[in-house]
């Protein structure tokens, strides 16, 4: 059974294996054991209530409960940009016009922005390619909404997600090549590694401070603004179906889109509800997949179950109860895994 649980110190080697499979561009999952150990420690201290909000971050792993194999990772930053500035570009427009010359030009322009400061962030989503089946990707991504719904007071009103931009298998980023490299004088992979290992001071020191006309970039770079890496397209679609939208903010490194949503408008958060759980043999039927989570802050668990999402009393097997660390009579959080398709 696949189970979402909080990260543990013993997971560091498994996270290193996952990091080696990302192909670069996933800034928050560098293949650096010291950095990953620090990240795990920060998550543990967050759960223990030892950190200020500006430093809090939760990390979860997807585990096969039968073998102990860690198949994926996902995380939530509680409030970005309160310690180190959180940069992105806002894609806007500058108009240059002259009535005398009968000239009017509306030029797409990149403006350096800290507009998402204080927002909660969904980040570090990665599923081992071998495990991209049977709803594991949906479980991994959406489990965070169950945690946010259960512990709403831990998070701010807006949640954002930076989507991985267009990078090829050799680590070549058209957006970086045309823009970032001119200011940072280093390859994308080097900048990505520095950022991922917490060495972010160079961003503030070297970032262009003035608006940038996108027409000055290569056509290849212009074409990838707000576009996602092919492997990230499914993750973008998942978030958009939950209510997230692209509001013209992009990543400063690879030009990938930043999606955002008011937390209370996220479908899985808004529609999740508490039901009583009982032990038994679940009813047979053509039921949809549903997320089921306990309400235990320190021992949080999420699993996928096929059941009636409208049920008032959820019947689970002993194995499912054990995976959720629940007992009969406890209340669990339940929501349909995917939004119902609207019919004409």
From Swiss-Prot:
Binding positions (succinyl-CoA): 125
InterPro entries reported for this sequence: Acyl_CoA_acyltransferase (IPR016181), Arg_succinylTrfase_AstA/AruG (IPR007041), Arginine_N-succinylTrfase (IPR017650)
GO biological process per UniProt: arginine catabolic process to glutamate; arginine catabolic process to succinate
Chemical reaction(s) catalysed: succinyl-CoA + L-arginine = N(2)-succinyl-L-arginine + CoA + H(+)
EC annotation from Swiss-Prot or TrEMBL: 2.3.1.109
Catalytic site: 229 (proton donor)
Entry-linked PANTHER family: ARGININE N-SUCCINYLTRANSFERASE, N-SUCCINYLARGININE DIHYDROLASE
NCBIfam families per the UniProt record, alphabetical: arg_catab_AOST, arg_catab_AstA, PRK10456.1
Function: Catalyzes the transfer of succinyl-CoA to arginine to produce N(2)-succinylarginine.
Protein name: Arginine N-succinyltransferase
Organism per entry: Escherichia coli O6:H1 (strain CFT073 / ATCC 700928 / UPEC)
Phylogenetic classification of the source organism: Bacteria, Pseudomonadati, Pseudomonadota, Gammaproteobacteria, Enterobacterales
